[in-house]
From Swiss-Prot:
Entry GO CC: host cell membrane; membrane
Keywords attached to this entry: Covalent protein-RNA linkage, Host membrane, Hydrolase, Membrane, Nucleotide-binding, Nucleotidyltransferase, Protease, RNA-directed RNA polymerase, Serine protease, Transferase, Transmembrane, Transmembrane helix, Viral RNA replication
TM stretches of this protein: 7-27, 37-57, 77-94
Catalytic activity: RNA(n) + a ribonucleoside 5'-triphosphate = RNA(n+1) + diphosphate
Protein name in the entry: Replicase polyprotein P2AB
Domain RdRp catalytic intervals: 694-808
Provenance organism: Southern cowpea mosaic virus (SCPMV)
Length: 956
């Protein structure tokens, strides 16, 4: 596919101008011999025509020179077993075999070491030579000529097929994606083949490669003329999603192809995953296709007959090969420093990427080894946006080498604000005043003014017709609805939620509980820019830019108050005002470190001083229970500004990332993913062990965020300071950030400002919300005497304590439910409810399926595959799946076409999920009796049949 370069656009503009000049001069008669411009324009048109002619001739010569020859194929004689094995007194176990094309039969002596494989053993599914494996219960389908993906290509060595690859798009160029062991095989590659046509391979340039069998890939720069001759198109590489249906392709040559279907299964390591699509000899490197593109590349088997292995090329290409400075946001890949590798408890895999360098890989993180990232040398230091400098009271974007220590940083204006922070405050155009106080019976709020940074107020979303129709089948949906929106709903719900706040004093055993909990968390290190006694503006600014461009920033989210006046999304804000945002953060961090008496400031004074921004309040658009809708108690989101989020990332990012990476060994679980069964199983195994120490119990805290106490937040920040080894200035900045955090100014959509009159309350949109809530929840369990606890936010499972509800009430938290977890008759742990999931041994499913289905039926963009990823393990899935497939909406069902090729999807290859409430899984479509499928004919000794196969061949 041709993509015009910048030069092409420049030439187009130049020629358009030249044509206009020539037309005006020679056609309309305004030519003046004394003017040189028409002559120059005419010369430009002539030169461009000559250049185009030369380019066409050059391409034609290259096109003609590329030789196309018939693909070499290998003729084989296939013998089919025509009877059961029998014992011969001379030769042992033998089988009678007949050639498929007819002819005399032969007797085959079975190797004694293989006799035990004759029954339906998984080992019989392994390919005779190589790393491929069929999957027990899987099927192969014949691919019609031309029905395979347009990007698929076979790699040949003479008449043998070494494997398969694909033409994929990568950062402005198309490359051949193929396994390293295929491209650099013992048999040299000689040609690329497609639909019986082949083109000889040459010594083409390699963009990147890795010989390690665990990261087995090569990206080859194949000339465009070769792709054109073979009619191969490019496709995109996508991130794999657990449970996604995938399709493999392969065969002995590029004309007679077969395909297999399976599902992708995520692993802890980002660079690999497993799948259940079958493969065969010569299928190495077959891309794993989904409806929208390629999600991986097959490299071998894991367990013979059970699962195959693939590498996540999205991770490889976007993190290890890409020359871009930012990472993709899809799956939270994180680049860490080599120093941080030593802080992880798990091992890292070190590999070398050709043309890139050495890199260490660990789960979802990676770190480049110094001097190993060769392509980084091509980046100029000047590529980094330069920090600002104050010159004569003005902000100048030029080289600046300023530093600051414990004194006020930079050149501060009156009131202790940097120039950028002053400009940020002016954007909000705050009109502070002393208004009336709203007495809620809990946390009081006072009207303190208004802001011109307002947000659109829209009406309540109507109930979709699809939801109304579905209530006849799923009456649970009638108990849900969309909440009201706008400032009226926000202030009403705020006062209701704030009424739950019950201020309490720190308990007497807080110090002991603090020390006990502290010992269960890993220790990190602060960013290098904070370790020195004197902070460098440039060092902090550079680190802020790195954080601001990371994949962890939600590009679609609002920047909050007041920067929403500059852009509606973080993506647009960073694209247009990156330097300004980075300068604000770089000014705010040392400003926080400079205040020793911040407790004397009111929330509005903190905003006026530039220490923090107002927190925007809005109603989350998710289905709410009807009882909450009647009460007007909606779920509120406290959107912390992007500047304050980046301040928190600078101060607490290292510790948060370490806790995410180490989630399996610590009480806090923000890093877990219950949609991946092996992670859910790891949680359950851990809980079963803890259950033997003290019986497990589930606690449901009502309105947790709105009942968080200031002493709980202080305990969390002090733990962060110790765990992160914060130097004095950084520790002061951290404490002051938390002081701003627990004494906030809230803003409604209409610009109304409200000030907290008491410290406390968790802000749901903070970068630290998940980690802080998890630690506070574990601290609460420690305070009431529970011997163990795991927590994800406000959800927890803990050791049972008598009178727990009353003890939690004494801490200021309303525990509306506290019950022991389900056990077996022998007392072993049977199931737990955690994070809206029921977790059992080797099983986890979402309990809030009505909300998920309600949202699905209300959103036309989602497909059945999206819904299946969330609810496939739910006991309700079969009923939901049957209903959704009956809806006359092709966008929702997508059931009639193959995932990428347009022919019918094999209903037996991917069975529906099992429900423990049904005696058997949903039956597949009835098979038809017919002649044996070509898949069984091609692989007769495997006992493999297609969906409509009579089973006449392949019997052992």
């Amino acid at each position: 596919m041709y993509r015009p370069s910048c030069l092409s656009y420049v030439l187009l503009v130049a020629n358009m101008w030249s044509f206009a000049v020539c037309a005006n001069a020679f056609i309309y008669g305004s030519y003046d011999p004394s003017h040189n411009i028409p002559i120059v324009a005419l010369m430009t048109l002539c030169a461009t025509g000559l250049w185009l002619s030369t380019s066409v001739v050059s391409f034609g010569i290259r096109y003609v020179r590329v030789r196309v020859s018939p693909e070499k194929t290998q003729n084989r004689t296939i013998y089919v077993s025509s009877g059961l094995p029998h014992f011969d007194p001379v030769y042992g176990v033998v089988k009678k075999c007949e050639p498929m094309g007819g002819g005399p039969a032969i007797e085959l002596q079975v190797n004694p070491s293989w006799i035990h494989l004759l029954p339906t053993s998984p080992a019989i599914n392994k390919v005779e030579v190589g790393q491929e494996s069929a999957i027990l219960g899987s099927t192969y389908s014949v691919v019609e000529t031309g029905g395979e993906p347009k990007s698929l290509v076979a790699v040949k060595s003479g008449d043998s097929t070494l494997g398969f690859g694909a033409r994929v798009y990568h950062e402005g160029m198309d490359v051949l994606m193929v396994p390293h062991h295929v491209w650099y095989n013992d048999k040299p590659h000689t040609a690329l083949a497609k639909n019986g046509r082949s083109v000889d391979t040459e010594d083409w340039e390699v963009e990147a490669a890795c010989a390690d069998p665990r990261i087995d890939f090569v990206l080859v720069k194949v000339p465009t003329a070769v792709w054109a001759k073979l009619a191969v198109r490019s496709t995109k590489v996508l991130a794999p999603v657990h449970g996604t249906a995938v399709q493999t392709f392969g065969g002995q040559d590029s004309k007679q192809l077969f395909s297999g279907l399976g599902k992708a299964k995520a692993l802890d390591n980002a660079w690999e995953f497993t799948h259940t699509a079958p493969t065969a000899k010569g299928w190495s490197g077959t891309p794993l296709y989904t409806r929208d593109g390629i999600v991986g590349m097959h490299t071998g088997y894991v367990d013979i007959g059970t699962s195959n292995r693939a590498i996540n090329m999205h991770f490889i290409m976007s993190c290890l090969v890409s020359k871009m400075e930012t990472l993709p946001p899809e799956l939270g890949y994180r680049e860490i420093s080599l120093e941080d590798v030593g802080l992880r408890s798990f091992e890292f895999l070190e590999v070398e990427i050709e043309n890139r360098g050495k890199v260490k890989l660990g789960k979802r993180e990676f770190a480049w080894v110094p001097k190993g990232k060769a392509w980084a040398d091509m980046l100029d230091d000047d590529d980094l946006p330069l920090p600002p400098k104050m010159v004569n009271g003005n902000l100048v974007w030029a080289d600046a080498q300023e530093s600051f220590d414990g004194a006020l940083p930079l050149n501060l204006l009156a009131g202790g604000r940097t120039q950028c922070l002053a400009a940020q405050i002016e954007l909000g155009d705050y009109k502070f005043s002393c208004g009336p106080t709203h007495e809620t019976g809990g946390m009081p709020f006072r009207n303190c003014g208004s802001s011109t940074c307002k947000f659109r107020e829209v009406s309540r979303k109507p109930v979709a017709d699809a939801v109304t129709a579905a209530t006849k089948v799923f009456p649970e949906l009638s108990e849900l609805g969309w909440p009201e929106r706008g400032s009226g709903a926000e202030i009403g719900s705020l006062l209701l939620q704030a009424g739950k706040f019950v201020p309490t004093k720190a308990p007497s055993n807080l110090e002991q509980a603090y020390n006990n909990l502290l010992s269960r968390y890993p220790r990190s290190k602060p960013l290098a820019c904070f370790r020195q006694g004197t902070w460098s503006f440039d060092a902090i600014f550079e680190q802020v830019v790195s954080k601001a461009t990371s994949a962890e920033i939600n590009q679609k989210a609002s920047p909050g108050v007041p920067l929403s006046r500059l852009a509606t999304t973080n993506k647009d804000l960073m694209a247009q005002h990156m330097q300004f945002v980075a300068a604000c953060v770089t000014g705010r961090v040392p400003l926080l470190a400079s205040f020793e008496d911040i407790h004397a400031l009111s929330p509005t004074e903190m905003v006026e001083m530039g220490l923090c921004d107002p927190v925007r309040l809005f109603v989350k658009q998710e289905p709410h229970p009807s009882r909450k809708l009647k009460e007007g108690r909606y779920r509120l989101i406290s959107s912390v500004s992007i500047v304050d989020q980046l301040v928190e990332r600078m101060l607490f990012g290292a510790q948060n990332e370490l806790e995410i990476a180490e989630w399996q060994s610590i009480p806090s679980k923000p890093g877990m993913g219950l949609s991946v069964i092996h992670q859910a199983d790891a949680i359950f195994r851990d809980l079963r062990v803890k259950h033997t120490v003290c019986p497990a119990a589930e606690a449901d805290i009502s309105g947790f965020d709105w009942s968080v106490q200031d002493w709980e937040l202080w305990a969390d920040v002090e733990m962060r300071i110790v765990l992160g080894s914060f130097p004095p200035m950084m520790a002061r900045a951290a404490r002051n950030r938390f002081s701003c955090f627990m004494n906030s100014v809230l803003q409604l959509s209409n610009g109304q400002l409200l000030q907290q009159e008491l410290p406390g309350i968790m802000k749901s949109g903070s970068y630290c919300t998940s980690s802080t809530n998890s630690r506070i929840r574990c601290l609460m369990a420690e305070l009431i005497g529970s011997p163990w606890c795991i927590a994800m936010g406000d959800d927890s499972v803990e050791g049972f304590v008598e009178g727990a509800r009353e003890k939690y009430a004494g801490l200021g938290h309303l525990c509306k439910d506290y019950k022991p977890c389900a056990t077996t008759p022998t007392g072993q742990l049977y199931a737990v409810e955690f994070c809206s999931h029921v977790i059992k041994r080797n099983k986890a499913f979402l309990t809030s399926w009505p909300k998920t289905l309600y949202r699905f039926l209300s959103t036309p963009r989602e497909t059945l595959e999206d819904l299946e990823r969330e609810l496939a393990s739910s006991p309700m899935w079969h009923k939901i799946q049957s209903y959704v497939r009956s809806i006359p909406s092709p966008d929702k069902t997508a059931r009639d076409k193959s995932i990428c090729n347009g022919y019918p999807l094999d209903q037996e290859a991917i069975s529906t999920s099992y429900s423990e409430y049904s005696s058997k899984s949903a039956s597949a479509e009835a098979t038809r009796e017919a002649a044996c499928c070509a898949g069984a004919q091609a692989y007769p000794s495997w006992g493999i049949h297609g969906p409509y196969c009579s089973g006449d061949h392949g019997e052992a």
